[in-house]
UniProtKB/Swiss-Prot annotation:
Motif residue range(s): Q motif: 41-69
Region (Disordered): 575-615, 682-725
InterPro entries xref list: DEAD/DEAH_box_helicase_dom, Helicase_ATP-bd, Helicase_C-like, P-loop_NTPase, RNA-helicase_DEAD-box_CS, RNA_helicase_DEAD_Q_motif, SPB4-like_CTE
Name of the protein: ATP-dependent RNA helicase DBP4
Family in the record: Belongs to the DEAD box helicase family. DDX10/DBP4 subfamily.
Top EC class of this enzyme: hydrolase
Domain Helicase ATP-binding: 72-246
Domain of life: Eukaryota
A Pfam family the protein falls into: CTE_SPB4
Gene that this polypeptide is encoded by: DBP4
Residue numbers covered by motif DEAD box: 194-197
Length: 765
């Protein structure tokens, strides 16, 4: 029987016409909407589709915040948006609703490819955005995908070609752009940067530039954050020239960027007393939910392990960027569900994460700038709820208060009651003495903190030379300050760039023009035993730990009985033997080598010939008189720089085009290779049916006509087997097809002659 459709062809056509008319009406309402004069309160008052509105209602999003009211319709009207709003003000919905509406009005399908790209600086924030999108977009027909580090890349590669809305971190998105054959960004409609200031900073600069280079320039761009850099160069990198700035928070009317319901305070304490203050605070606030921020993951790990053994009386959790993704997700779930818990964390959860009912935000280490402080304290007092924050500053870091005052943030000063303060130094010393691995953690925590102070840019706040290293080491329970080797700022910046670049991207950068990666090492099968023997120690048996303790061991041990008096010294000429003739063939070959003889003749000079045949050096120095005849030195310098800048700008455009074409060519070749592999696999799968006996040759009878007859009969039988059977029901009286009459089984017509014979048979009945 024929499949019964829900609607007939006429009804489906009417439904399409209704939807087109509804979309036109919606677009007209958007263009007529006056953002300045219309102060809507509810989402239903906005010109958005019924499916999006239904998803918002089911997710309990009824009333709008200020940033949502001001930015959603502006984004719907097609403008680029540069949005700033306080933490916890609902910026996520401010860009998710325009994304859904844009694709709905464009009638986007899975065959149109990627329509919207949302970039988040952290994995946790990307996961939160994805969860909100799934809730409010439950009644739409779009496909959404989440690509973050720590997940299976092959699983994402198989599905990324059919995704309409892609959410992810910069590194993984760029990896898919270079590696995923089916990912096509040429038709992208919207680019969204959540926490845009973090995405635009030096850590993600090259990655983001590479992503933007793969996107079409006529897209719509939305930037949102609680604190944003207004650098013209940052905006120019995103092709953001004509944009609408919405929700400015640094004006005199709005006051500070922190929520009004947040009560802020600070404590001045010595560096050696910070852990004592923290432990005493936790002991006196056991029935609260708090987040404690540190500057490095090693500090988080050390404080978590030591406090866990001292059992302060509250559940302890820790979260940092060096953990596996599964452990990070499980920790977040536990913290979401718990009501009385303390989370030790780094800045991976400082931005955008919507933690429910956080009572306290503690900052043990001073943040690098006021923007980081704003994002940290923004984890409390969200959506109008009350919250409190505390920052612990050393006497050397009091200048940070002036930085906060410049942004209209004035926390109150707290004093510590001596009766509530408890020293934990003896307990830490005892724990580190009993457990060498815990001592190693303490040494790494000490080194990471000192390095974090060294790399800070604000030297008025972070004074590296005034650090009390010995007292700080004793406060951690260490017997002395470990030896620290700092390589320099260039090496640290290079390490940061490598940290933000995925290994897959580094390997893809070594690919040839055909898109193939040539590994020098032969690919061998590595068993679990090979991996076990190749594994390096990460505890007290590691090389890093031995290097730390080497200086202490050298000081403790006595002088050796036999010592080296001198090393790598020069011998006197009278002690050297007279060697006039080479003593071996190797020495003779070395003495007669062309390379060795050229080394004694000095550097060669390269000459070029002019039109008259005169030889000139490649680089000739101009005389002083000739130089002054051309004009002032500063003017010549400016003229030279302007010319070179124009040349570099022209070449930059052509280089980008060439680079883009090379990437597309690599993708095309990779896609062609995949197609050939699939065809070969398909041919191998069905080759057995055609061969009917493997590699066996059958000889004929000697008569060519008999062999041809057998071949034709085999072909006809094979066609008969493969041909389909069609049931035609024909009413002889009414000359119409019916379901209740006799059934005549025939073959499906393949040629015009078959079709004519079938028609004749049906007419004759």
């Amino acid at each position: 029987m024929a499949k019964k459709h829900r609607y007939t062809t006429v009804q489906r056509k009417q439904e399409r016409q209704k939807e087109e008319e509804y979309i036109k009406e919606l677009e007209q309402r958007i263009q007529d909407y006056d953002v300045k004069n219309n102060k809507a309160v509810f989402f239903k008052d906005l010109p958005i589709s019924k499916s999006t509105l239904k998803g918002l209602n089911e997710a309990s999003f009824i009333k709008m915040t200020d940033i949502q009211r001001d930015s959603i319709v502006t984004s719907l009207q097609g403008h680029d948006v540069f949005g700033t709003a306080k933490t916890g003000s609902g910026k996520t919905l401010a860009f998710l609703v325009p994304v859904l509406e844009k694709l709905y009005r464009e009638r986007w399908t899975e065959f149109d490819g990627l329509g919207a790209l949302i970039i988040s600086p952290t994995r946790e924030l990307a996961m939160q955005i994805y969860e909100v999108l799934v809730k409010i977009g439950s009644h739409t027909q779009f496909s959404a995908g989440l690509v973050i580090g720590g997940k299976d890349v092959n699983f994402e590669l198989e599905r990324i070609a059919k995704i309409n809305i892609l959410i992810g971190t910069p590194g993984r998105i760029l990896q898919h752009m270079d590696q995923a054959v089916g990912l096509n960004t040429s038709n992208l409609q919207m680019l969204v940067l959540d926490e845009a200031d973090r995405c635009l900073d030096m850590g993600f600069q090259k990655t983001l530039d590479a992503i933007v280079g793969n996107l079409p320039p006529d897209r719509q761009t939305l930037l949102f954050s609680a604190t944003q850099s207004q650098s013209i160069s940052d905006l120019a990198r995103l092709s953001l020239t004509d944009y609408k700035k919405i929700g400015t928070i640094d004006s005199s009317e709005d006051g500070p960027a922190t929520p009004k319901t947040l009560q802020q305070s600070y404590i001045i304490a010595d560096l050696a007393d910070k852990l004592d203050v923290l432990y005493s605070f936790i002991k006196s606030h056991l029935k609260t939910k708090m987040i404690v921020f540190f500057s490095s993951s090693k500090q988080v790990h050390f404080v978590y392990e030591t406090f866990r053994k001292m059992q302060p009386g509250i559940s302890l959790l820790h979260l940092h960027g060096r953990q596996k993704q599964r452990a990070r997700t499980e920790t977040l779930d536990k913290f979401f569900r718990a009501q009385q818990v303390c989370l030790f964390a780094t800045d991976v959860v400082a931005r955008g994460i919507d933690f429910p009912a956080v009572d306290w935000v503690i900052q043990v280490d001073c943040p690098e700038d006021v923007d980081t402080y704003i994002h940290r304290v923004g984890r409390a007092a969200r959506y109008g709820k009350k919250g409190r924050s505390l920052i612990i500053l050393t006497p050397q870091e009091e200048a940070f208060l002036t930085r906060m005052a410049a942004k209209k943030i004035e926390p109150g000063k707290l004093t510590i009651k001596q009766s509530k303060k408890k020293s934990i130094k003896p307990q830490l010393q005892s724990l580190l003495f009993k457990d060498p691995e815990l001592k190693y953690l303490g040494q790494k925590a000490f080194i990471s903190y000192v390095k974090s102070i060294y790399i800070q840019k604000d030297k008025e706040v972070f004074k590296f030379d005034e650090l009390p290293t010995e007292e700080f080491a004793n406060s951690l329970g260490l017997p002395g300050a470990p030896r620290i080797k700092i390589k320099g700022m260039k090496a640290i910046e290079q390490a940061k760039k490598l940290k933000n670049t995925s290994r897959s991207l580094l390997s893809l950068s070594k690919a040839n023009d055909d898109g193939e990666i040539n590994d020098k090492k032969d690919k061998q099968v590595r068993t679990k035993y090979d991996k076990m023997f190749e594994r390096k120690n990460q505890t007290i048996l590691s090389e890093h730990y031995l290097n730390i303790t080497k200086s202490q061991a050298q000081e403790d041990e006595d002088e050796d009985f036999i010592t080296v008096k001198r090393k790598d010294h020069e011998l006197k000429e009278e002690d050297l033997p007279q060697l006039t003739v080479p003593t071996s063939r190797r020495a003779q070959k070395k003495a007669l080598s062309k390379k060795a003889s050229l080394s004694t003749k000095g550097n060669a000079t390269k000459m070029v010939f002019d039109d008259e045949g005169q030889a000139h050096p490649v680089y000739e120095l101009e005389g002083e008189e000739e130089f002054h005849k051309k004009g002032d030195a500063e003017e010549q310098k400016k003229e030279f720089l302007s010319k070179e800048a124009e040349i570099m700008a022209d070449r930059d455009v052509s280089d980008k085009i060439i680079q883009k074409e090379k990437k597309q060519e690599k993708k095309r070749k990779r896609l062609e290779a995949m197609r050939r592999e699939m065809e070969a696999a398909y041919a191998d799968e069905y080759s057995d049916e055609d061969e009917e006996g493997g590699n066996v040759a059958y000889l004929g009878t000697g008569n060519l006509s008999d062999d041809m007859e057998e071949y034709s009969s085999d072909e006809e039988s094979r066609k008969t087997k493969k041909s389909k059977t069609v049931d035609y029901r024909f009413d002889k009286k009414n000359k119409t097809i019916s379901e209740d009459t006799d059934i005549m089984e025939i073959q499906e017509p393949e040629t015009i002659e078959d079709l004519e014979s079938l028609t004749a048979r049906l007419i004759e009945g």
